[in-house]
């Protein structure tokens, strides 16, 4: 693993020497901008970005954005340096810290996705009984537990990596012997990938089975549950979970193949290793795109971040308000009669000032229920 992870690119003019910095730079820029905007949108005062009263989804999405932002800021530049430079230039402490943060944020993301899937299952399967459990306070406690577990599971990586001298070069490589490395890599696959993906699959699978099996007198409730489960937040988080499984799957598969299969060191296997890293790291910049495509309310809150968009929204609101004030009711009957199309509480009242010809100007005025 150390050998293939620290093979330098063949030559400065090779395709890899050009592609690797470009790909990692794109991941860094898109991830920083995208997740930064997600934080700015979710930290705005106001209702949930998903229009769900008392929603805990925003807190989990906020936690995912924080984990992705930490990963991109603290890990991607140094991993790019591993693949583009012949030596490690940042010292032993940074070598250990970078790899600790890689797995810390990976665990935080996977555990958060598992928590979201359970939250969505409870919202659909037990909408009333789970209301007292699915509160912002409990969501914050769940986020704290996620980071605590992530820290515990990733702590061994603080000593897993270290720096060694290879001739005149210093390299950042795994420092453990093979048996311990294999045990930790398998444990990371089981706890950081297999377990969360299994929880997500079971939670969303049971949710869909419940929705499709609901028949009889509970049909109306099932229809409402189906609408909520397939709503914007549910679809977005299911997409995010699927992307996580697809992006991190090849990374773990190659590690297992290295330990238990035939993994000869060659340019082809090196390219596979590099591609799996790029795919796993790209996962951190895909989530903001999913949120923006899934929720028009999220997009509306994003537009309010910019003064021009906010002014446009206010101008449109004022124009609509003026148009509504000029609307004359189509009905000639008294307010509130069965054929009246006017909203309840609105009536036509004469103003005191008369127009020419003895006509009285009529305006809409808001009155409470009589």
From Swiss-Prot:
Cited Gene3D superfamilies: Rhodopsin 7-helix transmembrane proteins
Membrane topology: Multi-pass membrane protein
InterPro entries named in the record: Galanin_rcpt, Galnin_3_rcpt, GPCR_Rhodpsn, GPCR_Rhodpsn_7TM
Disulfide bonds: 95-172
Lipid moiety-binding region (S-palmitoyl cysteine): 308
Main location: membrane
Membrane topology, Extracellular segments: 1-20, 79-96, 160-184, 258-259
Pfam families: 7tm_1
Recorded GO MF terms: galanin receptor activity; peptide hormone binding
Subcellular location: Cell membrane
Compositional bias per record (Basic and acidic residues), positions renumbered to this chain: 350-359
One GO cellular component term: non-motile cilium
UniProt entry keywords in alphabetical sequence: Cell membrane, Disulfide bond, G-protein coupled receptor, Glycoprotein, Lipoprotein, Membrane, Palmitate, Receptor, Transducer, Transmembrane, Transmembrane helix
Transmembrane region(s): 21-41, 58-78, 97-118, 139-159, 185-205, 237-257, 260-280
UniProt feature coiled coil, ranges: none
Positions bearing carbohydrate: 6
Stretches assigned to the Cytoplasmic side: 42-57, 119-138, 206-236, 281-370
Gene Ontology biological-process annotations: G protein-coupled receptor signaling pathway, coupled to cyclic nucleotide second messenger; galanin-activated signaling pathway; positive regulation of transcription by RNA polymerase II
Region (Disordered): 328-370
Keyword Cell membrane part of the UniProt annotation: yes
Family classification: Belongs to the G-protein coupled receptor 1 family.
Function: Receptor for the hormone galanin and spexin-1.
The name this protein goes by in its record: Galanin receptor type 3
Organism whose genome encodes this protein: Mus musculus
Gene: Galr3
């Amino acid at each position: 693993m150390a050998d293939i992870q620290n093979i330098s690119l063949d030559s400065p003019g090779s395709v890899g020497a050009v592609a690797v910095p470009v790909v990692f730079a794109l991941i860094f820029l898109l991830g920083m901008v995208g997740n930064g905007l997600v934080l700015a949108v979710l930290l705005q005062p106001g209702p949930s970005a998903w229009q769900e009263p008392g929603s805990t989804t925003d807190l989990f999405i906020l936690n995912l954005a924080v984990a992705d932002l930490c990963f991109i800021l603290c890990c991607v530049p140094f991993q790019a340096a591993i693949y583009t430079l012949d030596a490690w230039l940042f010292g032993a402490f940074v070598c250990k810290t970078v790899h600790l943060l890689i797995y810390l944020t990976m665990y935080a993301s996977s555990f958060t996705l598992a928590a979201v899937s359970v939250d969505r299952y409870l919202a659909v399967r037990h909408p009333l009984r789970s209301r007292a459990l699915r509160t912002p306070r409990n969501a914050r406690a769940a986020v704290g537990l996620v980071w605590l577990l992530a820290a515990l599971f990733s702590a061994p990586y603080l000593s897993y990596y270290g720096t060694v001298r290879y001739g005149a070069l210093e390299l950042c490589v795994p420092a453990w012997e093979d048996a311990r490395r294999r045990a930790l890599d398998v444990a990371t696959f089981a706890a950081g990938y297999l377990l969360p993906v299994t929880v997500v699959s079971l939670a969303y699978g049971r949710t869909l089975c419940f929705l499709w099996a609901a028949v009889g007198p509970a049909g109306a409730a099932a229809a409402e549950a189906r609408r909520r489960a397939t709503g914007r937040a549910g679809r977005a988080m299911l997409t995010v979970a699927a992307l996580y499984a697809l992006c991190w799957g090849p990374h773990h598969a190659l590690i297992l193949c290295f330990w238990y299969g035939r993994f000869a060191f060659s340019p082809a296997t090196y390219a596979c290793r590099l591609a799996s890293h790029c795919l796993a790291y790209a996962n951190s910049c895909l989530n903001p795109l999913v949120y923006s495509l899934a929720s028009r309310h999220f997009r509306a809150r994003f537009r309010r971040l910019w003064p021009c968009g906010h002014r446009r929204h206010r101008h449109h609101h004022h124009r609509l308000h003026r148009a509504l004030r000029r609307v004359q009711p189509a009905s000639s009957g008294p307010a509130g009669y069965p054929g009246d199309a006017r909203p309840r509480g609105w009536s036509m009242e004469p103003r005191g000032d008369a127009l020419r010809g003895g006509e009285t100007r009529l305006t809409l005025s808001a009155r409470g229920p009589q």
